[in-house]
Amino acid sequence: MMNEALKKLEELLDKDQFEKIKAINNPYLHSFLAEWIQWLEPSKVYVCTDSEEDEEYVRWKALYYGEERMLEMVRHTVHYDNYYDQARDKQNTKLLVPKGTNLPFLNTMDREDGLREIREIMKGIMRGKELFIGFFVLGPKNSVFTIPAVQLTDSAYVMHSEFLLYRKGYEEFKRLGPTKNFLKFVHSAGELDERKTSKNLDKRRIYIDLVDETVYSANTQYGGNVIGLKKLAFRLTIQRAVREGWLSEHMFLMRVNGPNGRKTYFTGAYPSMCGKTSTAMIPWENIVGDDLVFIKNLDGVARAVNVEIGVFGIIEGINQKDDPIIWQVLHSPVEIIFSNVLVKDGKPYWNGMGIEIPDEGENHSGKWWRGKRDAEGKEIPPSHKNARFTVRLEAFPNLDREALENPCGVEVGGMIFGGRDPDTWPPVRESFNWDHGVITMGAALESETTAATLGKEGVRAFNPMSILDFLSVHIGDYLRNYLEFGRKLKKTPKIFAVNYFLRENGQWLNEKLDKAVWLKWMELRVHNDVGAIETPIGYIPRYEDLKVLFRQVLNKDYSREDYEKQFKIRVPELLAKIDRIWKIYEPIDNIPEELFQELEKERKRILEAREKYGDYISPFALEK
């Protein structure tokens, strides 16, 4: 017998589209779709299966509706967002929680109020528009990591982006049958202006219902606000991971190639502008993913998968010299959506690309010319600093394809936390153990704000595990889950911290590619192939080992003087950091006691070393 929701869907959909939904035996899905199709009132509905025809239909519709335009290179298109819709809207992104829920640092709203408001905004918002329904999975299909998700959107650009970024999941939904275990995303770009960008930005809302695992976004097109399975799903999967005892992390996943063909996998969490992409893209190593991972305990071993199969990357500053692989991908005839870049004669241009940029063209502000100013009198650059490219990982020659598709994931040899400061953390170090690494490296992560982030330059932004913007649970619960996850493993990944941004007298102490050496050292440490120097803050490399690696990896000399400058233990700065981190956590209830214990032990070790060696300690003094 057909359930009520299915009957309703039969009325609402064309026969072909209805048959696609009917083939999925899931009454929970049927009632969700029936409710929202009625509420949104689209004039047409298209259901995407896993077929190439459906993907082609979406590509065509993105062009037909004017949300994307073709560029000169085959398979390349450009999309523009509203001039004032160019980044994640933190103010209007809210977690909907039951009354009385307290989540420090997070932007929350009473669930009943939030649902009432978003429903009001979205009532009939798709009149005269086409609704696309897409099915996807996070993580590999048919695996212990798989999380199914359904996306409703009136933007062909959003659906096109998700086809590039995620594994298709229609067949997976059919296989799973009547499960409630799927994530739900409802998006409308709202009314569009003549450039086909969202018009009613005053009604822009991104509401994340943590109870029903559903995200609603309205009157916005910027990827971070609307690509449901990206950072919106991330908040839902963090909550799920903490509840179920695994990790959902804002990390790259890469393979570092060791001696004799050995493959070692690392995850890495770095706040923006801290070197995450450039680390994951070192030409002679291999990428598995650049942004989001799931890590689970399988038979006592931490194993990780890339949640995605594509890259939604910042294009600013990508140039041939520093980013040869990405540059090559962006100039090859693979399917790419460029967003908010300058276009002239069908070619895309962006800030910092290292070649001459035309003096006029079209960009996110419309018709553009050099010196053009916006309504606030600010000069408009050729491309927006948050301009993006969306492309499948299979386009990258350095992709580790086997690791990307392995349903069991890959063993995590090491986890890297990458901060940014001019004077505190050494370039690379290893923690004493899991708890020490989680607390003094991950939970204490800071990045000095740069010109590229809003706010004052030179301020240290606290960003534990680089996850603060996306956290959806109490930070104490999140950290407790992290600590417990490691304790349950038979084989614990090593934890490392890196900092590529040390300065002395205004000069950088490291060159851009030095990070390639730190990776090789970490790979050797995972397998205990080299020794290390014990310091109050963890293990650092020995000069002799780095000297060999600099010659092997970069074919250059590495002086004792450089080593000493980079790896000296900076006592006053390290103590100041412990005080800063302590003060942030101290007023918050429900923080694991281990956090304060680890910080106190670290402080004690640093003070003891100061007694013996003074404020600035040469690594040679500590070498036993």
Curated annotation (Swiss-Prot):
Keywords: Cytoplasm, Decarboxylase, Gluconeogenesis, GTP-binding, Lyase, Manganese, Metal-binding, Nucleotide-binding
Biological process, per Gene Ontology: cellular response to glucose stimulus; gluconeogenesis; glycerol biosynthetic process from pyruvate; oxaloacetate metabolic process; propionate catabolic process; response to lipid; response to starvation
Binding sites annotated in the UniProt record for substrate: R88, Y222, G223, G224, S272, N386, A387, R388
Catalytic residues in the record: C274
Coiled-coil portions: none
UniProt GO molecular function: GTP binding; manganese ion binding; phosphoenolpyruvate carboxykinase (GTP) activity
Annotated TM spans: none
Protein name per UniProt: Phosphoenolpyruvate carboxykinase [GTP]
Cofactor(s) this protein cannot do without: Mn(2+)
Entry-linked Gene3D superfamilies: 3.90.228.20, Phosphoenolpyruvate Carboxykinase, domain 1 (3.40.449.10), Phosphoenolpyruvate Carboxykinase, domain 2 (2.170.8.10)
Family: Belongs to the phosphoenolpyruvate carboxykinase [GTP] family.
Free-text cofactor note: Binds 1 Mn(2+) ion per subunit.
Lineage: Archaea, Methanobacteriati, Methanobacteriota, Thermococci, Thermococcales
Gene: pckG
Enzyme class: lyase
